[in-house]
Structures are given as structure tokens and as C-alpha cells.
Amino acid sequence: MSQTETQENKGLGRKVQAFGSFLSSMIMPNIGAFIAWGFIAAIFIDGGWWPNKDLSELAGPMISYLIPLLIAYSGGRLIHEMRGGIIAAVATMGVIVALPDTPMLLGAMIMGPLVGWLMKKTDEFIQPRTPQGFEMLFNNFSAGILGFIMTIVGFKILAPIMEFIMHILSLAVEALVHAHLLPLVSIIVEPAKIVFLNNAINHGVFTPLGADQAASAGQSILYTIESNPGPGLGILVAYMIFGKGTAKATSYGAGIIHFLGGIHEIYFPYVLMRPLLFIAVILGGMTGVATYSLLDFGFKSPASPGSFIVYMLNAPKGEFLHMVLGVLLAAIVSFIVAALILKFTKEPEEDLEAATEKMEASKGKKSSVSSKLKGNEDNNATSTTASTSTSENNEEQSEEALLDNYDTENVDAHDYSKVNHVIFACDAGMGSSAMGASMLRNKFKKAGIQDVNVTNTAINQLPSDAQLVITQKKLTDRAIKQVPNAIHISVDNFLNSPRYDELLENLK
């Protein structure tokens, strides 16, 4: 494969990963609403833990109206802040009302960003042409007229299209289930998780289809396909017993983080360092899906994150053992296959650190969790190697120049006299950045720094008045473009960086 083809494939991979990140940014902030709806449905509907006719009436409107509107608002807000979100929610009512018996999550995921983009373009056209003194009139009427038009478009045009798409997808899923072929989906899902497509598959396909199934059947097996912690646990237990060196030593902590914390990316490097282990996770995933399919098991709401604790909380009444069996059998099969591979195949020269770098490169960004598998010296060496790699294309080189211009790795080069707010930013604004912000808050508390607030957010939601932004190096250029007037600091990983101690000294 030529260098040009390699760069094109790499660019395509990053675009797909970015698309998955955008879908995640619409769904993940609303997972709490899914969980609240799931609790209400699991507890109060007929056949629930404590059936209650009055309270069970909450479940239908929540999944039919509330959650699609929240998703549409989130999608519109990502494109054009609150104004885009509000009109996106208004327009989505057209799709919802046209198909009241089908949870319009997919429709909301399309309408939200689309209307947000249209609102942005409308404002860009109208605002420069608005007479002085008529700003409020033009702003309100332009938004109202766009909402009016797009609501009708949603009702008359998008709704029939979505009805057809949902029908085809539902038939495909049902056909796989009835033919007992749904486990074959793991052949795609498990490798995709380890590369970069997990967000696009889980939040773009399984969550909306699962919500549709759960609304009609009371539960959905689709919520278990990507989230089952069993295959990853089997891999890590195999390393605990048959692994060597760093991989064996770190597998114990990784197992806890993965199984109880639900952060699956922690086991990805262990698979990448022995590519034959893809077979183990695929067979483990297929086993879990087959088990749940045979037992007719499913969840009422998304199991996010994919933690065994979440699985226990989501398990329907009377089906706790079925839930455990699906996780256990998936872990056992994955463990057996992984153990055979580790025991009887030749160990490659590639180590855990190199595999971690490969995973991060394929995802197009650093991982704060998997970076715990690497020490300070290895991280610094990785950073140096990455910055001097001959495979970097012109775009990456321009990104490096941008970071140099902002002096993102020299903490002492900036003036912190007016800084009272530090923001950690990542793709979705919920996972790694939340852990980094929590860690820095603890450091500030121990150092007696009480007048500096530390929060986290998604990069595309950084406020325009941000003062100090901390991002992983691969994402810093995006943060700079979002808020060019802020101080930007790059770190190799959120949980382990010498930059924090330097920052403490400057803020004291």
C-alpha cells in the first residue's frame, strides 16, 4: 500500500471516528434521561418490580416525546448553540407527531444537526442585513419561521422516510434474531470497538433501534451487543494467568477498571499487541449475544457505561441469572480462546506500550485510561517518537506548528494572573475529561488553591470566554480553533502529566 493510500485510509478513519464522536455528543449527555425512563419502565409497568398504573403512564411520553426532543436539542446545540437547539427541538415535533407509535430517536438525530445548521446559515445571512433597532424582531421571527417550515418538512417529508428506514432496519434485526444469526453481528462489532467505530455503531444504530424495540416489546437485546463486559474480562483474566511482564502486571487493575468501571478501552491494547486475540473477543461476543438471544433477554434502557454494576441495576425482574449467564459465558469463551493463544502462539516483539500507541493512533487521539498502562518516561518517549514520525502528513505538521505557536507544552510561558477557571476538554466531555478534572481538583485542594474552579466539557462546547483549556495533544488544535483567545496546555494523558505540577506552581 502506497503512502498516499495509507494517508487517505487514515484520514477516512479519523472522519468516521469524528462522526461517531458527534453521535456520541448527541446521545451521551442524555443517557441519564434514558436511565430514568428505564427505571420507570422497569419498576412501574405491568410485569415490573412494583407495578403502578398511574406512574407507568410516564414511560410512554418520555420515550416518545422527551428523549427525542432532548436528542434533537443536543444535536442542534452542537451546531448553533442554544438557538440551534431550540429550533431543532421545535422542528422534531413534526417527525414525532407524524409517527407517534415509534420513538423517533433516529429522526431526532437527523433533524437536530440539520436544523441547527440551517439556523446557523439563516443567522449568518440575516444578521448583517438587519436594520438597527429591529434585531429582536428579526431574530425571533427568523427562528420562528424556520421552525414552522422545518416542522412541516419533518411531518410531511422526513417522517415517511424515517418510517421506511426504521421498518427496514427492524426487519433486518428481526430476521437475524429469528434465524438465530444475531451473534454474527459480533464479527463486526467487536473489532470495531477496538478501532474507532464503537460510538457510531452503539449510539448511531443500537441505541435508537433498541429504544424502538424496548418501547414495543418491553426490552431489547440490542442494548447488550456492544456493552457486554464479558469478552474484555476474558482477555484480561487470560493475561493475569498467562501473560508476561508489563501486560501481566497491569492486567489486574485493568480488569477492575473494565469490569466494574465499564471503561472498555482499557483492554484494547491487550488485543492489539496479539492480533489473534481478535478471535477471542469475537467468539466471546458471539457467545454472549447467542446466550441472550436463546434466553430472550434484553434491557429496558441502554447499559452505559458497559459495567457489570450497570448490568445488575438494569436486569429485568426475574432475569438476574440470565444476565449473569450471558456475561459469564462470554467471559469464559473469550478466556479459553485467549489462554490458548497466549499459551501456544509465539509472543511478538511488540509490547504493551507500543500496542497502546497503535490503539490511540487508530482512534485518532490519546486515551487517558489506556495511558495508565504507560509510565511517565514511556509517555515522554512516545510523545517524542510521535512528533518526529516520518509518517505524519502535512495536516499533522500544520497542527504541530499551531501547537508550537501557542506554546502548549511550556506551562511557564503564560500569564495566569487572571485565571480563575480551568476547563478540561475532550470529545464527548464526559469520560476522560471528567476524570482529569476530578484529579486536578484534588491536587488544587491539597495545594490549598481554592479560588480556581475546575470543570470539564466537550471541545465543541467550550465557552468563548474560556481562560485556560487543558486537552490531550491530539485534540489541542481543535480546542485552539474553538477558543483561540484562551491559554491552551497539551498533555499526553489526563491522569498522569508533569504539566499539572508546573501549573500548580504558577497558580499559587
Swiss-Prot record:
Keywords: Cell membrane, Kinase, Membrane, Phosphoprotein, Phosphotransferase system, Sugar transport, Transferase, Transmembrane, Transmembrane helix, Transport. The modification Phosphocysteine is found at C426. Residues 1-30, 78-141, 194-280, 343-508 are cytoplasmic. It is found in: Cell membrane. One of its GO terms (molecular function) is kinase activity. The keyword Transmembrane helix applies. The chain crosses the membrane at residues 31-52, 57-77, 142-163, 173-193, 281-300, 321-342. GO terms for cellular component: plasma membrane. It is an enzyme of class 2 (transferase). SUPFAM superfamilies: PTS system IIB component-like (SSF52794). It is a multi-pass membrane protein. Residues 420-508 form the PTS EIIB type-2 domain. Residues 19-351 form the PTS EIIC type-2 domain. Residues 367-392 have a biased composition (Low complexity). It holds the Pfam family PTS_IIB. It catalyses: D-mannitol(out) + N(pros)-phospho-L-histidyl-[protein] = D-mannitol 1-phosphate(in) + L-histidyl-[protein]. GO terms for biological process: phosphoenolpyruvate-dependent sugar phosphotransferase system. PANTHER family: MANNITOL PERMEASE IIC COMPONENT, PTS SYSTEM MANNITOL-SPECIFIC EIICBA COMPONENT. The EIIC type-2 domain forms the PTS system translocation channel and contains the specific substrate-binding site. Homodimer. This is PTS system mannitol-specific EIICB component. It comes from Staphylococcus saprophyticus subsp. saprophyticus (strain ATCC 15305 / DSM 20229 / NCIMB 8711 / NCTC 7292 / S-41). The gene is mtlA.
